[in-house]
Amino acid sequence: TTMTQNTALTTPRVVLLDIEGTTLPVAFVHKVLFPYARTHLPALLAQQSDNPVVVQALAETAQLAPGVPAAEQLERWMDTDAKVAPLKSLQGLCWEQGYRQGELVADLYADVVPTLKAWKAAGLTLAVYSSGSEAAQKLIYGYTEQGDVTPLFSAFFDLKVGGKRESASYR
């Protein structure tokens, strides 16, 4: 068999999208979202200490960094842009407050919404896979300059399915 026969292209059924640099500028995450979470995280930890998401994230932080105070470890992770589930969950909670209070609005690239709508109309399944939590992904697409575009997506995947560089995450 020739190389051409072995690499026949099939029509795609799913478009799996990342967020940063794909549907909105990387700068939005690094210059808006991350600083917002860093500023608001201490108050969130104090005010929502009984929130199950906070309790679980702090327990996971303690498991990943035994003997290090949680707030200190979270700061370290933010300093290094670590892709760890407990930090992402807590950042997501901070952002949820910001979006709901109108302090945060995602500005997607101009071609994103028309393209997503065209793909959806063509019968493609649209999904997101990002290191940001599933909840954070839904907030980004739920509070955009173009309105709520979450109905265009069929699925949202985060680090709970595995790392983006691990092939098993895509199975």
Located regions from the model:
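Short, Lys/Arg-enriched N-terminal segments with co-localized hydrophobic residues
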Residues: T1-T2
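Asp-based phosphoryl-transfer active-site loop
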Residues: L9-V29
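Short, solvent-exposed loop/turn segments at secondary-structure junctions
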Residues: T22-T23, H30, W95-E96, S133-A135
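Conserved phosphoryl-transfer catalytic core
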Residues: A27-R76
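Metal-dependent phosphoesterase signature
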Residues: A65-A110
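Short, compositionally biased "basic patch" segments
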Residues: W77-L90, S131-E145
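Substrate-recognition element of Asp-dependent hydrolases with the DxDx(T/V) motif
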Residues: Q101-T144
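Substrate-recognition "cap/lid" segment bordering the active-site pocket of phosphatases
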Residues: S133-R171
